């Protein structure tokens, strides 16, 4: 089977209408509901609204550029879950894991052939 190219239909975030004009209006998206709203009525030249057409391909959704999906790992036993799925998932160590446990997780992943996306994070070299 041929590999499917990962295509993101939109990478820019959808901004809230008039968030560039007023400081009190945040940038996070809100659906316009006013009866005279130009954005809701989809006038030409206004910002675009999120809709179903911007969705990505189901087979490549949530994929990283290397083609793997991230799986959050909090302990060594979570790495063992990826043993049979190391071609589709990559381990990503959670941010609240200590440096000592990180070393154990990375060693276990290397033994099982599981890729770790943030293997070098928070791990200091022996001085």
Swiss-Prot record:
Listed GO biological process terms: cytoplasmic translation
Compartment annotation: Cytoplasm; Nucleus, Nucleolus
Superkingdom to which the source organism belongs: Eukaryota
UniProt GO molecular function: structural constituent of ribosome
Keyword Membrane attributed: no
Electron transport keyword on record: no
SMART domains: Ribosomal_L32e
Pfam family, one: Ribosomal_L32e
GO cellular component, one term: nucleolus
SUPFAM superfamilies assigned: Ribosomal protein L32e
Leader sequence segment: none
Keywords recorded for this protein, A-Z: Cytoplasm, Nucleus, Ribonucleoprotein, Ribosomal protein
Additional notes on this entry: There are 2 genes for eL32 in S.pombe.
Record's function text: Component of the ribosome, a large ribonucleoprotein complex responsible for the synthesis of proteins in the cell. The small ribosomal subunit (SSU) binds messenger RNAs (mRNAs) and translates the encoded message by selecting cognate aminoacyl-transfer RNA (tRNA) molecules. The large subunit (LSU) contains the ribosomal catalytic site termed the peptidyl transferase center (PTC), which catalyzes the formation of peptide bonds, thereby polymerizing the amino acids delivered by tRNAs into a polypeptide chain.
Homology family: Belongs to the eukaryotic ribosomal protein eL32 family.
Subunit structure, as described in the record: Component of the large ribosomal subunit (LSU). Mature yeast ribosomes consist of a small (40S) and a large (60S) subunit. The 40S small subunit contains 1 molecule of ribosomal RNA (18S rRNA) and at least 33 different proteins. The large 60S subunit contains 3 rRNA molecules (25S, 5.8S and 5S rRNA) and at least 46 different proteins.
Protein name, per record: Large ribosomal subunit protein eL32B
Species this protein is from: Schizosaccharomyces pombe (strain 972 / ATCC 24843) (Fission yeast)
């Amino acid at each position: 089977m041929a590999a499917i190219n990962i295509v993101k239909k939109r990478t820019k975030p959808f901004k809230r209408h008039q968030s560039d004009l007023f400081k009190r209006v945040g940038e996070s998206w809100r659906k316009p509901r006013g009866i005279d709203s130009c954005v809701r009525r989809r006038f030409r030249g206004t910002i675009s609204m999120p809709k179903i057409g911007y969705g990505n391909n189901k087979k490549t959704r949530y994929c990283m550029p290397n083609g793997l999906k991230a799986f959050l790992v909090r302990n060594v036993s979570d790495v063992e879950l990826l043993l049979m799925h190391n071609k589709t998932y990559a381990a990503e160590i959670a941010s609240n894991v200590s440096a000592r446990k990180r070393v154990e997780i990375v060693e276990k992943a290397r033994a099982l052939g599981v890729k770790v996306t943030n293997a070098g994070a928070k791990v200091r070299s022996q001085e």
